[in-house]
Amino acid sequence: MPPKKADDGPKQHPIIGRFGTSLKIGIVGLPNIGKSTFFNVLTKSQAAAENFPFCTINPNESRVPVPDDRFEFLCEHHKPASKVPAFLNVVDIAGLVKGASAGQGLGNAFLSHISACDGIFHLMRAFDDDDIIHVEGNVNPVRDIEIIREELRLKDEEMIIAALDKLEKVAVRGGDKKLKPEYDIMCKVKTWVIDEKNHVRYYHDWNDKEIDVLNKYLFLTSKPMIYLINLSEKDYIRKKNKWLIKIKEWVDKNDPGALVIPFSGVLELNLQDMSDEEKQKYLEEKMTQSVLSKIIKTGYAALQLEYFFTAGPDEVRAWTIKKGTKAPQAAGKIHTDFEKGFIMAEVMKFDDFKEEGTEASVKAAGKYRQQGRNYTVEDGDIIFFKFNTPQQSKKK
């Protein structure tokens, strides 16, 4: 039975954020809340984790493998010579303080580090420890969220005012009709962010033209945010802490739809020093589990990233692409010749491959697809690209 041809996918709408796949997610929060400890555990690196503000001056950056059972299955099946998973780029950014947008602490430098990131792990402290000072004097994660929220908004306010001043001179007083639509959109952004004191991402109905303008400026408050609550090991295991409900209520009211993930930096740090067997035994005894994999996967998805697989005895590899990527551009991730000479993508769904067991069986079951240049690649697709070169037709 010949492979089936499928219809081209629907038109994709633009996404707020930087286009590309080398995207970063930054760990943001006040000083002394466990950011560097979390970064060390997440990346298994040894960034300084001292007990004083601003111990992280230059942002530490690391690549973290994205856990995926599908990748592990393909590696076990093919037993390849090379295994390359997808990676999440994580940046540990020094603690912000109240007044950072006005230059307090090392505020301007830190805010520029956030600007270079594409998403935010907003870390907050919900544990008491007399040995670890809190920059605000006491533990109150809801207050801490408000501080970070306002500092990011104030920095965007500066950018919006400066942009509008420039646009008004050219588009309004100068009569440049080409820039008038951008001026009108920025006026709407000003109303939302400055007058109504919201974050850009709180508004979910920006149209395509508005998103194009937002992506020109890449405001801090447009970046996707995941809220991470750092608990004591005791509170995390028993799933009880007086701040959990208060934080969830704040997020539901102010940033609806955003994810809130409780974790314990101390627990994760302790688990890191254990063997796999000791770790499993400890977690079973405590009737709890690590959430690091969940945090990594959530951060990767928040950047609007996904991946397809190429798989065989030589290599199993996850290729990172932006959601909505068409087949020729996905092929170009492997080699520019694949995109230039693209003929088709031969696609298997992972679940079909796992169920049928072999490529031949997938074909025999009529589940093997030939896709054209308008096909939108889906997360977990297993793809073989056919392409032309000046010499001959090739296949990977």
UniProtKB/Swiss-Prot annotation:
Annotated localization: Cytoplasm; Nucleus; Nucleus, Nucleolus
Domain OBG-type G as annotated: residue spans: 23-283
Motif (Nuclear export signal): 267-274
A matching Pfam family: MMR_HSR1
A GO CC annotation given for this chain: nucleolus
Gene3D superfamilies: 3.10.20.30, P-loop containing nucleotide triphosphate hydrolases, TGS-like domain
Highest taxon of the lineage: Eukaryota
Gene Ontology terms for molecular function: ATP binding; ATP hydrolysis activity; GTP binding; metal ion binding; ribosomal large subunit binding
Domain TGS: 304-387
Residues reported in the UniProt entry to bind ATP: N32, I33, G34, K35, S36, T37, L231
Keywords assigned by UniProt, alphabetized: ATP-binding, Cytoplasm, Hydrolase, Magnesium, Metal-binding, Nucleotide-binding, Nucleus
Cofactor: Mg(2+)
Function comment: Hydrolyzes ATP, and can also hydrolyze GTP with lower efficiency. Has lower affinity for GTP.
Subunit (UniProt): Monomer.
Protein family (similarity comment): Belongs to the TRAFAC class OBG-HflX-like GTPase superfamily. OBG GTPase family. YchF/OLA1 subfamily.
Record's protein name: Obg-like ATPase 1
Native species: Xenopus laevis
